[in-house]
Amino acid sequence: MNTDLAAGKMASAACSMDPIDSFELLDLLFDRQDGILRHVELGEGWGHVKDQQVLPNPDSDDFLSSILGSGDSLPSSPLWSPEGSDSGISEDLPSDPQDTPPRSGPATSPAGCHPAQPGKGPCLSYHPGNSCSTTTPGPVIQVPEASVTIDLEMWSPGGRICAEKPADPVDLSPRCNLTVKDLLLSGSSGDLQQHHLGASYLLRPGAGHCQELVLTEDEKKLLAKEGITLPTQLPLTKYEERVLKKIRRKIRNKQSAQESRKKKKEYIDGLETRMSACTAQNQELQRKVLHLEKQNLSLLEQLKKLQAIVVQSTSKSAQTGTCVAVLLLSFALIILPSISPFGPNKTESPGDFAPVRVFSRTLHNDAASRVAADAVPGSEAPGPRPEADTTREESPGSPGADWGFQDTANLTNSTEELDNATLVLRNATEGLGQVALLDWVAPGPSTGSGRAGLEAAGDEL
């Protein structure tokens, strides 16, 4: 129980400390006052070691330098690169110890690893290097590598920690135990168990070896193709690691290229399917277009025929309408003004009738007789005869008086026939002079009456 508690405390302390605090870790373990191992009684060998002066030894110097220099001067670049890294150059990037496989030595027992004594368990040595404990071959029992147990009950005089319980008939298989240097290096990772799990994930233990390199079929093919042979045991050199990373990068590139080609093929297949569907649809549309063009041509022919028929009917109707319009216009201009009830009456306008002298047949006869009488030789000498004129005017039976009355009667009859007798008479009297009326009513001597008749006839003509 005490052993497990001490081991758990030491593991937790190693996990919580950084590599820089290596001195504090040693103080935490071996301090007399507050150390974890202060209650553990050391063997006689440790007491003699205190009293005796330790002689310088190159092995002990290497051990001390590895312990003291691991926290202060860690190597700037790791000797191995992470397993999942892609880069061929591993010197520039620091690596996590949980991704780096621990170095393993050959299958034979090194100088620092001593065989187990009879009756005692496997021993752990503080000598720097690999601490693989070897026992006699026997039945193998697989023990998880993540569990680290250290028995602190007994210290051997030689400075080795040995278990008290006797060896079982079944021995443990060869496995890699952790040294103080591994504990110090594992402090930077933060988890000792993850370190072992990561190493066991990348590598697998082989028969008689601590670790074995596992290659896939593709990696083996590429290595054989390039003529490169990698060892099956770890650790690998930097050149071999770069070659392995290069091979794995080629495999990843090949897989990505295959994926891209697959996607490209699927895309091209989809495009070809769409193109075939579009081609079929295009052909169907072309057939429809040809059918529609034929229908359009037939409709255009029918439209032309209809336009010709409409033009002919329109010209005929226009001619008929023109004729009818001309007839109606002529009828309106010629007939309507004559029958219009609102038009002015021509008979009522005073300007339509002009005064005209009308001579009766009697007057013409009298004038002709007078002209004939004046032309006979030996007629009466001309001269005024006022008495005779007066007598004629006064006597009612004289021919002058008869002519005057007949002229007045004829004028009255003619005015009664024309509906406007008074107006015609007035115009006639105004047109005739007073002298002419006096001459007609009371003519003078025969010469004067004949001359007056000729003048009247000349005026009439």
From Swiss-Prot:
Lumenal-side segments: 344-461
Localisation: Endoplasmic reticulum membrane
Membrane topology, from the record: Single-pass type II membrane protein
Main localization, broad class: endoplasmic reticulum
PTM sites of type Phosphoserine: 173
Protein name: Cyclic AMP-responsive element-binding protein 3-like protein 3
One Pfam assignment: bZIP_1
Disorder association: Hypertriglyceridemia 2: An autosomal dominant form of hypertriglyceridemia, a disorder characterized by elevated plasma triglyceride levels. HYTG2 patients also have increased total cholesterol levels and low levels of high density lipoprotein (HDL) cholesterol. Reduced penetrance has been observed.
Low complexity biased stretches: 63-85
Effect of mutating residue 294 to R: Loss of ubiquitination by SYNV1/HRD1
Site (Cleavage): 363-364
Cross-referenced SUPFAM superfamilies: Leucine zipper domain
Gene Ontology terms: biological process: positive regulation of acute inflammatory response; positive regulation of transcription by RNA polymerase II; regulation of transcription by RNA polymerase II; response to endoplasmic reticulum stress; response to unfolded protein
Post-translational modification: Controlled by regulated intramembrane proteolysis (RIP). Following ER stress a fragment containing the cytoplasmic transcription factor domain is released by proteolysis. The cleavage seems to be performed sequentially by site-1 and site-2 proteases (PS1 and PS2).
Membrane-spanning intervals of the chain: 323-343
Cellular component GO terms held in the UniProt record: chromatin; cytosol; endoplasmic reticulum; endoplasmic reticulum membrane; Golgi membrane; membrane; nucleoplasm; nucleus
Alphabetic keyword roster: Activator, Disease variant, DNA-binding, Endoplasmic reticulum, Glycoprotein, Isopeptide bond, Membrane, Nucleus, Phosphoprotein, Signal-anchor, Transcription, Transcription regulation, Transmembrane, Transmembrane helix, Ubl conjugation, Unfolded protein response
